[in-house]
Amino acid sequence: MPMYQVKPYHGGSAPLRVELPTCMYRLPNVHSKTTSPATDAGHVQEPSEPSLRALESRQDDILKRLYELKAAVDGLSKMIHTPDADLDVTNILQADEPTTLTTNALDLNSVLGKDYGALKDIVINANPASPPLSLLVLHRLLCERYRVLSTVHTHSSVKNVPENLLKCFGEQARKQSRHEYQLGFTLIWKNVPKTQMKFSVQTMCPIEGEGNIARFLFSLFGQKHNAVHLTLIDSWVDIAMFQLREGSSKEKAAVFRSMNSALGKSPWLVGNELTVADVVLWSVLQQTGGSSGAAPTNVQRWLKSCENLAPFSTALQLLK
């Protein structure tokens, strides 16, 4: 018998029903249509500011330009790797901005460095068996821009140098003291496999190859080009040195086709101004005999335009 008797708290014989919770806290359904919107809408993205939209527009323009430049470089690469393809590189991309040329002489200190009053002397070693005509043309052009002290020497490695090569700079009578010149240009006829250049014997390695030296010398004119024109100019210089000078007859024919196409659209290879591409290609054509009557019509016209300029006609006399 129990000590205490307690009445059951549920009704008689009815089953016990206990509602157990399924979550710790109950919240209203946020997806319900009847639910009022949240008062704190700080997490909602605000409309973009005008400055942000302008930045996005600039980004789109830059990306579009990069894609166009990539297409131009890919096209030039295709022409170099497949020299038999008749590819018109001038139509790959037209420059949005015209080529601008500086009319004032470039500050040589910005390119050659400061020598604290010493004359900046460019020294070139060249083989008389293959005179670098492009460098002689550029020398004459430099003389029109700067006061250049020009000298010619002969190295002991060569025995006989033609008289016209010894006088390739003309009669050099020094009328001024050395420190009054802006630039020194020393040419040494030497038995070297490739043309070499130095302008600071103590601090730099030599630049080798006629094309590379021509690029450097032409940079002293301060000529400015956009990225597309610079790519085309470098491509033409490489084509001259590797395909036109050392390539097969098939490669040379492809170069003539590309030149003829480019010169049909502009008086010079890249635009309306003379560039280092014209100088180097003209030099290689003269050295390899490619300037004969077999050249296409536009190339023949371009050759005459080059030879009408005094620096080209003077250099051409060295081959006679």
Curated annotation (Swiss-Prot):
Residues 220-317 form the GST C-terminal domain. GO terms for molecular function: molecular adaptor activity. Gene3D superfamilies: 1.20.1050.130. SUPFAM superfamilies: GST C-terminal domain-like. Residues 162-225 are annotated as: Interaction with TP53. It comes from the Eukaryota. One of its GO terms (biological process) is translation. The modification Phosphoserine is found at S36. GO terms for cellular component: aminoacyl-tRNA synthetase multienzyme complex; cytosol; nucleus. Residues 31-51 are annotated as: Disordered. It is found in: Cytoplasm, Cytosol; Nucleus. Residues 82-162 are annotated as: Interaction with PRKN. InterPro entries: AIMP2, AIMP2_LysRS-bd, AIMP2_thioredoxin, Glutathione-S-Trfase_C_sf, GST_C. Required for assembly and stability of the aminoacyl-tRNA synthase complex. Mediates ubiquitination and degradation of FUBP1, a transcriptional activator of MYC, leading to MYC down-regulation which is required for aveolar type II cell differentiation. Blocks MDM2-mediated ubiquitination and degradation of p53/TP53. Functions as a proapoptotic factor. Part of the multisynthetase complex (MSC), a multisubunit complex that groups tRNA ligases for Arg (RARS1), Asp (DARS1), Gln (QARS1), Ile (IARS1), Leu (LARS1), Lys (KARS1), Met (MARS1) the bifunctional ligase for Glu and Pro (EPRS1) and the auxiliary subunits AIMP1/p43, AIMP2/p38 and EEF1E1/p18. Interacts (via N-terminus) with KARS1. Interacts with EPRS1. Forms a linear complex that contains MARS1, EEF1E1, EPRS1 and AIMP2 that is at the core of the multisubunit complex. Binds FUBP1 (via C-terminus). This is Aminoacyl tRNA synthase complex-interacting multifunctional protein 2. It comes from Rattus norvegicus (Rat).
